[in-house]
Amino acid sequence: MGPDNRRVLLATVLSLGIITLWQLSPWGRAPKPAPKPAQQASQPAKPAETAAPSAPTPAPQAQPAPAPVPVNAPEELITLEGSGFRVVLTSHGGALREVHLEGQKFRRDTGGGQLEPINLVRVTEGQPYPLAVVASPELGGAQDAATDPAARAPMRLVAHDEHSATFEGRAGNATVRKVFRLTGRPYELGLDLEVSGAAAANAGVIVLYPGFMPPATKSGGFFSGPPVEFMRPICRAGQSTERFDVNGKEQMARGEGAVQWAGLDQGYFISALFPSEPKGACAFARGPVAGSGETAIRLPMEGDAARYSLSVYLGPKDLDLLRAYGRGFDSAIDYGTMARPFAFFARLLLYVMRWFERLVHNWGVAIILLTVLVKVLLYPLTAKSMQSMNEMRKLQPEIEKLKAKHGNDREKLNLATMQLYQQHKVNPLGGCLPMLLQLPIWFALYATLQTSVELYREPFLWIADLTRKDPYYILPLAMGVSSFVMQKLSPQPADNSQAKMMLYFMPAFFTFIMLSVPAGLTLYIFVNNVLSIVQQQVMMRRMPPAAPGSAASASPPTVSARPAKR
């Protein structure tokens, strides 16, 4: 392969890297295959492989059924202030009406510069509120249960204080008592659920967690960047974490194995329900309108009455908080199919940036310091690369002579150029290695910006959110200029057409791609380019100049036409 073709190969590799970055994004990522479709017949849930055996929870004595609540009973709302969040409970279904996250970081622009706390509860007309309960004989009926009027039936508020609220009512033929309580843990709400009267007819109770992605929050095209909000039903069943595409072909699917936790993945946030121990089964279903869906957990009845103690996590996907829960909860952070091989590097970059952020208290500066650290670690390879580029620059006069000698005969020109490199022991690809080593870091940093709530809505200079594109396109344009300067300072290929492609097309194409990439990644690449330019100039000045006649006096290689091999 000739040296010019090697340059084309490098350009192809970089293009593939850029295309891969495109595929990593939500607007370029292929949808995940849906979990196994649900069967109509009820199937017993498989026990969790790692769950320790435990004795069944003693069933409470069945209490007399409370008087039915009128269907037109007015809605009662109770607010509980927890650690990092505020929940509003409704008597309609005894469920979550609103979940607001506290802190300036967790605010959403509602238009006109107005910010309001993020609300994790998003349901559409016809959906029950999260944590509604329905008695059902099988999990296959979860889709029907989501539209069952019993899921929205009024319940009676029987007790409440600043730390808890208790609701009683009926769900179909079952008597239900719910006690919501603050646990003191960040973003956690406890739920004590008592159900009686459902065993004979249904032998099970379903807890619903529906959600809705408003169409207005979807991506509006390439230059708008990836969607800020999205919603996917999610379940950790057994040792597998499964997600359901609400816009896919399947109407319903179920998880296999005892439920560790289940709920809704909401990008940088998650709402998840934890049974006290892995049990039951989960299912996913599409909602009544496009963009809506629900996760359902079916808990078995053991006798005529049963009591369940559950925990509900309602907050950001902070890696430390998720790991504290165990049960594979950190698998809720999904780097996507393309970036999954770089998950280790993504978490490593996050740890390094967190350490820098604690020192400088700004994530943009932390990214700059990360760039400097990577340049220092790659310095030995960069120095060797610069030396190789310097040697190639010395050979430019000889390459020009070869071009004049062989004219348009590319085969002879490439062969003569390669012989010239071999004669002077120059590796034409030596200058490419540091850039190739940067590609995994780009992928990992992109995945980190798309999944790590630590960087969500973190500002830097004029940029309000490093996880979103630069709204003024200053960084992408600056990055394009720096890429052009780097190419201009690098030795050019012998082929003028290839030289023009490397000098003009690649920086322009790269700039176009980076217009909608998270600003944090663009900042990293721009700073890396600037450091590379400075490093190149400093090292070139320190390198000894070419000895007089060292390359110019050397006779250019004589190339004779070789007969083609048969």
PLM feature spans:
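Generic low-polarity alpha-helical segments
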Residues: 68-73, 80, 187, 534, ...
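Soluble non-transmembrane domains of integral membrane proteins
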Residues: 77, 81-333
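Intrinsically disordered, low-complexity sequence elements enriched in Ser/Thr/Gly/Pro
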Residues: 4-5, 44, 84, 150, ...
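Mixed-charge, polar/low-complexity N-terminal
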Residues: 1, 60-62, 66-69, 244, ...
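Preference for short coil/turn "hinge" residues that link or interrupt alpha-helices
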Residues: 73, 111, 173-175, 257, ...
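Helix-loop-helix
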Residues: 1-39, 89, 191-194, 215-227, ...
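Juxtamembrane extramembrane loops of integral membrane proteins
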Residues: 24-120, 167, 171, 556-566
